[in-house]
Amino acid sequence: MTPFPMRLSRAGLLVTAGVALSAQAAPPDQLREQVPGWFRMMVDQHEVTALYDGYIDLHTGLLKGMDQEALRDHLDALFIDTEQGVQTAVNAFLVHTGEYLVLVDAGSAACFGPTLGQVPDNLRASGYAPEEVDTLLMTHLHPDHVCGLVDGEGEPVYPNAELRASRDDADFWLSEAQAEAVPEDDRAFFDMARNAVAPYREAGRFSTFEPGEELLPGLQARDTHGHTPGHASFLFEGGDDELLVWGDVVHSYGVQFDDPSVAIEFDTDPEQAIATREAVFEGAAEDAHWVAGAHLPFPGIGHVIRDGEGYRWLPVEFGPIRDDR
């Protein structure tokens, strides 16, 4: 016969276990929040910080040059959801060269809706301040790259920076005559570009560059026009490794690496955009340099390799900043 005190002790344990199980049955609410959108790595002496601006859902009908059913089947095979459009990242890149703090592209601000506009907050979360940026380089003047130059009141987000864009893109997107020459429904992009650039221009801190120009020591502008008349990429050189920040060479990684001949509705010159993409892919695969893309899945940094008749994207692996590599 079990002694009475031991029976009480066992009963107490059962009660305690019941209370514990009851407590575990009510977990906390799901948080459903993501970590801040920044990623950092070194490319030789350059400290590169990818900044997530957010995402936009692109309808598959915007992609041209492939049958839509085949396009969706191709994306479905890669587990890329197309039901609400293809979720497409918008990235900017902050490069500390050791002498300069360079921001390539500025994100969308409020121009394309509430899923975008996170570059300034993520820049701060990464440890820098907008006031510390001294150089702003625009791959091109589409709204998802330039609207983030100004805040909601039209004031510069980067008050101490010199803003630079290619001459051909500036001559096109900042031209009132060019804006008046297009249908009224197409003028919004021109208005957004002019509004974003205006305060820098008024302050005497806007200038243009030519393809091939050395913008800073070890930083060269590359001609990658086609998507826009003056679309540019930026090659950060030095040591054994290089980084090409290529803007909108790719809009759909799930399709265009396999088939570079697929264009997008927003291309000013689709045939030239295709030729540029093929040349840039070939160069990236041949030279094995790092690539950073505005619409590649965040952080948008990696390598391009040949894969049969097409190419394949190899994204960077997350990890610590290492001095031994």
Report residues per predicted region.
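Active-site metal-binding loops of divalent metal-dependent hydrolases
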Residues: D53-G54, A106-A109, L141, D168-D169, ...
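Conserved beta-strand hairpin/beta-sheet module of binuclear metal-dependent hydrolase folds
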Residues: E33-S126, S233-V250
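Bacterial N-terminal signal peptides
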Residues: G12-S22
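Active-site environment of divalent metal-dependent phosphoester hydrolases
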Residues: P36, H59, L141-G148, F172, ...
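Metallo-beta-lactamase
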Residues: P27-P28, G117, R124-Y128, E132, ...
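Bacterial N-terminal signal peptides that target proteins for export
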Residues: T2-L13
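Cap/insert and terminal regions of metallo-dependent hydrolase folds
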Residues: L235, G239-R325
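Active-site metal-binding motif and surrounding structural segment of the metallo-beta-lactamase
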Residues: N91-A92, P114-R164
